[in-house]
UniProtKB/Swiss-Prot annotation:
It is found in: Plastid, Chloroplast. Belongs to the universal ribosomal protein uS7 family. The gene is rps7-A. The keyword rRNA-binding applies. Signal peptide: none annotated. This is Small ribosomal subunit protein uS7cz/uS7cy. It holds the Pfam family Ribosomal_S7. InterPro entries: Ribosomal_uS7, Ribosomal_uS7_bac/org-type, Ribosomal_uS7_CS, Ribosomal_uS7_dom, Ribosomal_uS7_dom_sf. The lineage of its organism: Eukaryota, Viridiplantae, Streptophyta, Embryophyta, Tracheophyta. It comes from the Eukaryota.
Length: 156
């Protein structure tokens, strides 16, 4: 733990084409081994496919998908005095929820069958915006787990 004080939170930069911070957050999560230009290519191709599929603004589809997948409540594993572990429901803030939503969308799109990542990502984003898809199932499973363990909420 640092003794110098708390580091100030850095804000995400906006991407060069859409001038949007959310797009840059998604690109940073797509990126592997520092290959940011490849991550931009994947996202921009996915955005083009969304434009072709829905004929609406693809940024609105992206925002809608992330908003639908963002969880309000989650579970955190806690160990009690006897050594058994319990999943305690906790509230999730907006920033952490957005980060989880982006992560879940990318994981669900990677698991999809398909040709390339851009195609899979575009399909997952369109499905999530409509209220279906793997990321939505993940959110619902998390909410179900938190609801089932609601009696343990006082263990925080």
């Amino acid at each position: 733990m640092s003794r110098r004080g708390t580091a100030e939170k850095r804000t995400a930069k906006s991407d060069p084409i859409f001038r949007n911070r959310l797009v840059n957050m998604v690109v940073n999560r797509i990126m592997k081994d520092g290959k940011k230009s490849l991550a931009y290519q994947i996202l921009y191709r996915a955005v083009k496919k969304i434009q072709q599929k829905t004929e609406t603004n693809p940024l609105l589809v992206l925002r809608q998908a992330i908003r639908r997948v963002t969880p309000n409540i989650g579970v955190k594993t806690r160990r009690n005095k006897k050594g058994s572990t319990r999943k305690v429901p906790i509230e999730i803030g907006s920033k952490q929820g957005r980060a989880l939503a982006i992560r879940w969308l990318l994981e669900a799109s990677q698991k999809r069958p398909g040709r390339n990542m851009a195609f899979k990502l575009s399909s997952e984003l369109v499905d999530a915006a409509k209220g279906s898809g793997g990321a939505i199932r993940k959110k619902e499973a998390t909410h179900r787990m938190a609801e089932a363990n609601r009696a343990l909420a006082h263990f925080r």
